[in-house]
């Protein structure tokens, strides 16, 4: 059977099956011409079919390389072009919604000016297999050009006003789009971090599979973002001045596009954090390490007078040695877990491995009691779920008169977080006091901001009695007054 002229058509999603009698088909013979079939330079034009579709919604469908599609709707008509199944995740990519009757011109020849044969009084939009519906794609530079900016001084005034009125909840929601490590080092006070630096998160956010709320890591940030119905939303990165010039692949563009899709009207901080910090550094939060340097005056001599060792500008993580935090509690890295001689010399009989991938070294020898806490050093890892399990294992080692080594990859973030939490549990130390105590013993520690937030939540539960402290017997080796 010869192929139907409708076999070469654009697939659209219609509200109901299209029957042949619903289509206004006309064959324009004016383009048949007197072309010589044997000529190589002028291929013959067989026909041009103009199809007038009366539909309220036209949805661009993914290409054939995308998700599987079916044109079989159960209709007995071979001309039915209803799409029975399609990828719902692509519905939000491009849509053309007409208030009245939408007339679409479809041509089987790209050389045919088919739109000239459509009534000029009707709203016309061209369709092609490559371009889809003739409507602007969400997130184009034209749309981002309409996003307003806010100057650093204006944001500072808003923040100061809310602070003086003691109503911080009425202030704007501030979103930081920079990489997580940069946010960890410094950010505007009260800003929540959106983690869309990885390709998977960016793609899911662009496709509408997740929202900006899903990418906020801390609980306080989520709660604040849920209450933004009447709030301003201010988004910033490192140094953007013109939102219209932001590339579509940049996190700032993706976040703005997602917020616009949710019906929000975000503002962009002109010049980003770099510009804001120049005149308003007092309204920025820095990491605890930077705060400590300021507290001691920033000088190396002052720092060395308060801490056993000065905090280096770039910690020598690779050459860090096994660190005794308490007489029976040691904090180390992967190399320390392999050093059998040192572990036996220090009477270590228990080991906590806070990784998902490092092996349990010397496990087959039966010399140590092991516990693995499968955790990654990421802004999405829930490390607090392992606190009590780790505490019980540490106490078991303590009661048996054995030392315990807790380690992760480098002994910087994951294992350090659990040690800090253990000190908070068994003393009256605040999170900051416990952090500084461990930092004084092992200067390279630097829990990521996600873990610091979990420690703050843990401190709140300890203070409120939700999680009881264990103060007896008193820990030996805690020299500070707590």
Curated annotation (Swiss-Prot):
Q: Where does the record place the Tyrosine-protein phosphatase domain?
A: 321-464
Return the annotated region ranges for Interaction with MAP kinases.
Answer: 199-215
The EC number of this protein is: 3.1.3.16, 3.1.3.48
The UniProt entry's GO CC annotations, sorted and at most eight, read:
cytoplasm; cytosol; nucleoplasm; nucleus
Q: What does the UniProt entry say about where the protein is found?
A: Cytoplasm; Nucleus
What coarse category fits the chief subcellular location reported for this protein? cytoplasm
Q: How does the annotation summarize its subunit structure?
A: Monomer. Interacts with MAPK14.
Q: What is this protein called?
A: Dual specificity protein phosphatase 10
């Amino acid at each position: 059977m010869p192929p139907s002229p409708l076999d070469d058509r654009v697939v659209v999603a219609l509200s109901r099956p299209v029957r042949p009698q619903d289509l206004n088909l006309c064959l324009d013979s004016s383009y048949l011409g007197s072309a010589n079939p044997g000529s190589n330079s002028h291929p013959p034009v067989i026909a041009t079919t103009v199809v007038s579709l009366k539909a309220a919604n036209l949805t661009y469908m993914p290409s054939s390389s995308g998700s599987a599609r079916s044109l079989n709707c159960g209709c007995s008509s071979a001309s039915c072009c209803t799409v029975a199944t399609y990828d719902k995740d692509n519905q939000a990519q491009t849509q053309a919604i007409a208030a009245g009757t939408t007339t679409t011109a479809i041509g089987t020849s790209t050389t045919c000016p088919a739109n000239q044969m459509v009534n000029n009084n009707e709203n016309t939009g061209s369709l092609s297999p490559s371009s889809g519906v003739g409507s602007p794609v969400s997130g184009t530079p034209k749309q981002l050009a309409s996003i307003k900016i806010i100057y650093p001084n204006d944001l500072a005034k808003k923040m100061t006003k809310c602070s003086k009125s003691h109503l911080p909840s009425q202030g704007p929601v501030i979103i930081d789009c920079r990489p997580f490590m940069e946010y960890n080092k410094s950010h505007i006070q009260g800003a929540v971090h959106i983690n869309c630096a990885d390709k998977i998160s960016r793609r899911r956010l662009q496709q509408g599979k997740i929202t900006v709320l899903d990418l906020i890591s801390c609980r306080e940030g989520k709660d604040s973002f849920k209450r933004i119905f009447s709030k301003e939303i201010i988004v910033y990165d490192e140094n953007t001045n013109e939102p219209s010039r932001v590339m579509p692949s940049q996190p700032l563009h993706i976040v703005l596009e997602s917020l616009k899709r949710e019906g929000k009207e975000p503002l962009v901080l002109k010049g980003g954090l770099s510009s804001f910090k120049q005149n308003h550094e007092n309204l920025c939060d820095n990491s605890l390490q930077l705060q400590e340097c300021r507290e001691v005056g920033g000088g190396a001599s002052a720092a060395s007078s308060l801490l056993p060792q000065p905090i280096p500008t770039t910690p020598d993580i690779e050459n860090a040695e096994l660190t005794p935090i308490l007489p029976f509690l040691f904090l180390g890295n992967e190399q320390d877990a392999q050093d059998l001689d040192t572990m036996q010399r220090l009477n270590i009989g228990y080991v906590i491995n806070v990784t998902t991938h490092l092996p349990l070294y010397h496990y087959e020898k039966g010399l140590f009691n092991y516990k693995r806490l499968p955790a990654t050093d990421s802004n999405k890892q829930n490390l607090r779920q392992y606190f009590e399990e780790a505490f019980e294992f540490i106490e078991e080692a303590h009661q048996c008169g054995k030392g315990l080594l807790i380690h992760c990859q480098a002994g910087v973030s994951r294992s350090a977080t659990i040690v800090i939490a253990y000190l908070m549990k068994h003393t009256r130390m605040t999170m900051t006091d416990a952090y500084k105590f461990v930092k004084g013993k092992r200067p390279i520690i630097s829990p990521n901001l996600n873990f610091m937030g979990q420690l703050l939540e843990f401190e709140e539960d300890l203070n409120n009695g939700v999680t009881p402290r264990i103060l007896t017997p008193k820990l030996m080796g805690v020299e500070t007054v707590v």
